[in-house]
């Protein structure tokens, strides 16, 4: 498949994901979920769980398409830390669906722990991938602007993740469980928006690179 089509697929997948998750926020009964306190994964426990699962898997597939587009255009080596991090992001998303959210009030569970670990891996892997991809191009005359935008979104994602780290760090001192110490739903939604924007940024960058490759030489 041509890199431009792969990049378009990546951006299209993000659009589908945003529409589906957005619908869960406004259509009953999932609209009753508190977006400030409850995580996005809460939708997987409701009757419209399939919508949530499809949205996340579509995003994972679009992320893989974006990764392939980055490789095909030469923006990212296939054998690189950035490629590994992007693959971990996509695998983490798939694992979030495979291991559904657990109600920790009834006690621990293996699949609940797997869900939580998969979420952390995914949320951290994408900004790392973005920073690694951009690092090689930050001084490039053509792609420096794209690299700067990618770095900005990668750093924004890490900033959005920071409240979770703070909540975990202060738990031993406050005695308040970390997910109650912060508005976890709002934090996760801000993080999710930053990360889907990062995927779009990477896909758009690879689409522009593919367009340059296809343009006739000027002499």
What kind of region is each of these model predictions?
Residues 3-12, 75-88, 142-156:
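Interfacial segments of alpha-helical transmembrane regions
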Residues 15-33:
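Alpha-helical transmembrane segments of multi-pass membrane proteins
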Residues 42-61:
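Interfacial helix-start motif at the membrane-water boundary
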């Amino acid at each position: 498949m041509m890199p431009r089509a792969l990049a378009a697929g990546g951006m299209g997948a993000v659009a589908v994901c945003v529409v589906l998750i957005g619908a869960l926020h406004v259509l009953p009964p999932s609209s009753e979920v508190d977006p400030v306190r409850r995580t996005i994964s809460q939708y997987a426990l409701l009757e419209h769980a399939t919508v949530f699962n499809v949205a996340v898997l579509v995003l994972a597939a679009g992320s893989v398409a974006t990764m392939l587009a980055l490789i095909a255009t030469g923006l990212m080596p296939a054998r690189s830390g950035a490629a590994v991090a992007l693959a971990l992001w996509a695998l983490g998303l798939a694992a979030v669906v495979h291991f559904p959210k657990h109600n920790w009030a009834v006690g621990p569970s293996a699949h609940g722990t797997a869900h939580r670990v998969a979420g952390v891996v995914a949320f951290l892997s994408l900004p790392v991938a973005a920073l690694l991809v951009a690092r090689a191009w930050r001084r490039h005359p053509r792609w420096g602007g794209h690299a700067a935008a990618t770095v900005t979104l990668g750093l924004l994602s890490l900033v959005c993740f920071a409240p979770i780290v703070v909540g975990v760090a202060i738990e031993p001192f406050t005695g308040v469980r970390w997910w109650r110490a912060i508005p976890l739903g709002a934090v996760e939604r801000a993080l999710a928006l930053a990360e889907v924007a990062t995927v779009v940024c990477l896909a758009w960058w690879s689409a522009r690179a593919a367009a340059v490759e296809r343009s006739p030489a000027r002499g």
